[in-house]
Amino acid sequence: MRELLKKLKIDYLLVNSTNEFLVEYSALSENARYTLTGFSGSTGDALITKDKIYLFVDGRYHIQADMEVKPNIEVVKLELGQKQDDEIKKLLNPLKTLGIVAKKVSQARLESFKGYKIKLLESDPINNHSETHIVPTIVAFPPKNYEPEKTTFITNLEEVSYLTGYRDFTKDYSSKIWAKMVINGDLILFTDNEACENYLKNYKGELIVDKNTISAYDYALIKKPIHKASDIKELKSIKSEQEINAYKKAFDATDKAMMAVRKFIETENNISEADIECRLRYEFKKQGAKNLSFKPILQLIRIRLLHIILKTQKI
């Protein structure tokens, strides 16, 4: 790792769990932190120094990190109230250079390191792989009527999915589409990062962005960025009749699926956690679910390891 830092002309490297859409719950194939440390938890970044590699995990993953990390990696176990970046900063010398992958951190997070010497990297030296994503075709709901005062660049995938009505059910535990969007009277949807970058480079006017969700890379391309916290969250809180009916239908289906799983547990013998997960998937899909919203958290005998992989041991 010393040679890598020397080659990049930096003293430290921040290694992220997020991908280029700033999504933490992404495939391990594009998770640089997993590539470096072997830790498969959904959150937590790593820091490479000239002497050590540090992995930062919250209370959900203290035991799992010890079980999974590669040798010679120091696990920093965050306690309640501790913030990851605060602990990272304690390991930094402000006079030395921290390398940050511009496409994998938000502009807001980058600015939180003000006062430290930063070198932005265009590509990830640990894992620069990016999964391919399909062009969205499924319209789950009608598009929303959202008319901002000025041209707005939206980078939050949940918000893009909400405004367009598009959904992508090809990925596990996700229905959001992988796209960015500009609204300037018309709606311009970018499913290709290169096309989006070219648009940002050539756009000469003011562009409203949310620093909490735009990557530092995209932000640097914009000539006249105006930061404004997204108001789409408030818009999402007002449900249409169609959305309310969809919720009611989903709640009813969930009740039926969970009652069936409960009956399975009560009546079957010699089953494992993995058996129950398979049954849960079956019952939800039987009720019409396209997929599960998140990986099941199911524990019978290892309650302290809620987020680790399910066991096949019979119970």
Walk through the language-model features, giving the residues of each.
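Phosphate/diphosphate-binding loops
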Residues: 211-213, 289, 304-315
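N-terminal glycine-rich flavin-associated loop
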Residues: 260-268, 302-307
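Extended, domain-scale alpha-helical bundle/helix-rich regions
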Residues: 81-116, 121-147, 172, 208-224, ...
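N-terminal accessory/capping or targeting/presequence segment of soluble
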Residues: 1-90, 105, 109-203, 307-310, ...
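Short coil/turn segments at secondary-structure boundaries
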Residues: 17, 154-157, 260-263, 292-297
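Short, basic/aromatic beta-hairpin or loop at an interaction surface
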Residues: 22-26, 291-305
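Short beta-strand/loop turn elements enriched in aromatics
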Residues: 10-15, 20, 281-295
